[in-house]
Amino acid sequence: MDEEKRLVFGLVSRLLDYPGKDLVDSAADIEQWAGKIPGGSRESLLDFLSYLRKTPLIDLQEEYTRTFDHNPGLCLNITFHKWGEDKKRGTALAELTKTYNEAGYEMNCKELPDYLPMILEFISVCPEETGFPLQEEYGEQFALMGSRLRAIQSPYAKLFEVLI
């Protein structure tokens, strides 16, 4: 994976996490990093960052909760979109944990290992031979979520444009 794609995945990881004051405060720094990315990815990220900077924090939090927490079709636990509650999902979660551990990656949040921001952060820092299979494994789910977000005209759709 080239450095540009790593940067994109790292930025999207940060922007897909629950919005707090620290995210809003760091928007200008994130915007500088996004400005270094060529092409359409830059424009999509800058469009989302414009929304982030113009929207009051409480409204950002309400939109995030309404979009990802109250809508099962958009939950950020990516294996749910592939397997639902099937036992294969449990196997996938165990495999993700194993992948993280073998790569020396510390899961530093209280989410399940399939939490999309965590997967994206991992892909942005891990060796290509480890991250590329995850992109391949869940690329269809990234596209599906992007399509669903576009259908409801969510500002978060811009972030999924750069993942596929």
Regions of interest found by a model, annotated:
Residues 1-115, 121-164:
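Charged, alpha-helix-forming regions
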